[in-house]
Every structure is written in C-alpha cells, then in structure tokens.
C-alpha cells in the first residue's frame, strides 16, 4: 500500500468489439473459440466473471457478442506485458460504451481493481493503471484495507467506485529526457502471483528491511519522474542504477530472485537497466541516452 511506480505501456494493443446479439458470447483471437456467458471453459472464466461483475455496476442486461483482439500474446508465448489487466480494461471500456454508461479512466481502473480484490487476484494493479494510459504512468497504490473495509460493509459496487480511494494516484507523465528504453523478452516466463505469495509468506520476518526498501523505492521513483520531465537523461540513468541496487537489496533478504543470469548480462551491456515487473523473467529493460527524444523499443525475439 502507498508504494509508487513508473509504468510504461507498450506498442501492442488489446481491442474489444461489441455488437448486438440474441445471447452474450465471447470470442478471442488467442483461443480462437467462442463461448457463452455461462458456458464452462477455463480459458474464459475470468472474462465471464468480469462481465457479470460489470452488470452490478451498469444495472443493464443487454446481450451482445464480444470479440477480443489480443496482441500481447502470440504463438502460445507469455511475454509478461500485463495482458490480464489490459484485457479487463478494454472489456470495461467496450461494455460501458455499448451500454451508454458514462465513465472516465479512474472509473475503469477502480472497476478492474475492485473485481480483482473481490476475486482474490493479488498484485499491485500497476498493469491496470498502465493500461488506461498511453506512454508512462506515475502510479501510487491505494490503501487496500480501505477498499476491503467498504467491501466488508456490503457497500454496492457503485458506492465503492464513487468513493475516493485512500492513497490512489494515477498521473500521465510527459517525458522530455532524451532516453531510450530497450525492452527485451527473455523467453523465461515468471508468474507474478507466485512471487507475491512467496513474499507474503516471509514478509513478517523482514518488516524493517521492507520498510527501508519501500521508502527508498518511493523516493527514487519520484526522483526518476522529475528526471524524465526535466530533460535530464544523465540523472535518469543514475537514478535507474540506484533503483536496480534497491531491488537487489530486496532480493538479499526476501530470497525472491530479481534477475536471472541472462537478465544480468543484458543489463550490464547497457548504460543502466533493471528487470520489469516482479523479476526473474519475461521482460528486461536496458536504458541508453540518445540524441533525439524519449522512445521505447520492444523486442519480442527471445534473448
């Protein structure tokens, strides 16, 4: 709770189309199959539950055919690009638009985050925050206990969404620094949920160390945000190096691996670098000063 992060979107999209239909069906380009809203299929369970959850908010029971075009997965490869959060964001926008329910980006974030909390889907919700913006997003995580208290009080979905969430901040960042982010797929898949479970199991033994880690991380993230906004690529690279050092400090006491050997080699071949997400797989980031403007290059060939 209250932890901050800078998260960037990637030049890959999830697009959702909806059209009127006699019954509600879901088709996606990954599974290449269509299922009914109440039809049993493990590949669609999350989406089916989310659609039913949205009806609590919209109070609308229109039937429709929903199609999901997903560029964040390909050829059965998991890239670690936050696709589950992005899918739910795209579905929420499509359904609310289809049902003529007004919304803004904050509404969409809260709907997806609340659904995840109610279904015990752990995580920072950073992928959700990144999915509502293009480019870089500054995100401060809400106080989860504040939201859980509203759930325990049996407040309606609409009441919870319309309440200001303690600690939540989502802000679009406009980078001016001449910096290139070189994002590369490692080919080594990692499940963020497993890292979260592992940390929850051991965190009570390292309360002070974790407090130091979070305090340092939040300070460095704010510094990096300022570096990016002030055309200060040199300072940004230095801040990124310090962020990596802090993550390796977390690794030292949490025993959660941050970098594989492949990732270390990639990072050390760039001016600065770090893992993406919870570490140990999926995407690794290299950073270089350039002579043009801020840019992100995503390479999904296996490292």
Q: How should these model regions be labeled?
A:
Residues 1:
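Short, Gly/Pro- and small/polar-rich lid/capping loops
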Residues 7-48, 52-60, 71-77, 97-103, ...:
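C-terminal nucleotide
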Residues 62-64:
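Residue-level recognition of the N-termini of beta-strands and the immediately preceding loop/turn
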Residues 67-68:
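Hydrophobic alpha-helical hairpins/lids featuring a short glycine-rich hinge
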């Amino acid at each position: 709770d209250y932890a901050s992060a800078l998260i960037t979107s990637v030049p890959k999209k999830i697009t959702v189309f909806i059209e009127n239909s006699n019954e509600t069906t879901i088709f996606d380009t990954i599974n290449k199959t269509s299922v009914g809203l109440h039809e049993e299929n493990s590949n669609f369970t999350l989406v089916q539950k989310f659609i039913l959850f949205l009806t609590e908010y919209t109070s609308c029971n229109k039937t429709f055919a929903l199609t999901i075009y997903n560029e964040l997965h390909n050829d059965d490869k998991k890239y670690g690009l936050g696709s589950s959060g992005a899918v739910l964001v795209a579905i929420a926008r499509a359904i609310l638009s289809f049902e003529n329910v007004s919304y803004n980006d904050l509404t969409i974030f809260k709907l997806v985050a609340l659904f995840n909390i109610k279904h015990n889907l752990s995580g920072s919700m950073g992928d959700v925050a990144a999915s509502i913006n293009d480019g870089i997003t500054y995100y401060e995580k809400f106080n989860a206990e504040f939201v859980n208290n509203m759930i325990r009080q049996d407040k309606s979905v609409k009441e919870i969404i319309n309440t200001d969430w303690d600690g939540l901040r989502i802000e679009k960042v406009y980078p001016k620094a001449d910096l290139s982010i070189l994002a590369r797929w490692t080919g080594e898949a990692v499940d963020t949920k497993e890292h979260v479970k592992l940390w929850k199991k051991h965190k009570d033994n390292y309360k002070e160390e974790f407090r130091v880690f979070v305090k340092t991380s939040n300070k460095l993230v704010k510094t990096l945000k300022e570096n990016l906004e002030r055309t200060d690529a040199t300072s940004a690279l230095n801040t990124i190096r310090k962020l990596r050092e802090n993550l390796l400090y977390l690794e030292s006491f949490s025993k959660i691996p941050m970098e594989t050997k492949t990732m270390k080699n990639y990072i050390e071949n760039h001016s600065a670098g770090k893992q993406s997400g919870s570490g140990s797989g999926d995407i690794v980031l290299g950073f270089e000063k350039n002579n043009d403007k801020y840019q992100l290059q995503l390479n999904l060939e296996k490292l």
